[in-house]
Amino acid sequence: KSSAASDVYKRQAQNNLHPNGLYLFDEPEAALSPQRQLTLLMQIYSCAKEGAQFIIVTHSPILLGIPDADIYCFDNGRIHLCEYEDTESYQVTEMFINNRQMLLDRLLTD
């Protein structure tokens, strides 16, 4: 299970995130449960309020939801600012949660 990896990541984040830093994260959610992603969201938000800057590549609708974040989307070779609700990660997650059985029926039917 990935809990050992997520514990290591959490400890590193707690010990290594400082105000006024610049941080580059590439899919930090990969080893994190949704609960750990929420913890990371709180840590990032707290440091950002103190002046730290973050560039995060993510597909996580949780991390995309960091308050006051500028979200850049990559569509058809174009990079542009977009709203949280307009991200593919949000839309697919919302569709799955709100229409799980219908979506599964469509996807899993021959």
Task: Tell me the role of every PLM-derived stretch.
Residues 1-5, 9:
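Single conserved hydrophobic/aromatic residue that forms the stacking wall/gate
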Residues 11-16:
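Conserved alpha-helical scaffold flanking the Walker A/P-loop in AAA+ ATPase domains
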Residues 19-22, 50-55:
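Loop/turn-to-beta-strand initiation segments
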Residues 21-24, 40:
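A short alpha-helix capping/helix-coil boundary motif
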Residues 26-28:
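Walker B catalytic acidic pair
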Residues 30-33:
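ABC ATPase nucleotide-binding domain "signature" loop
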Residues 35-53, 60-110:
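C-terminal lobe/lid and adjacent interdomain/linker elements of RecA-like ASCE P-loop ATPase modules
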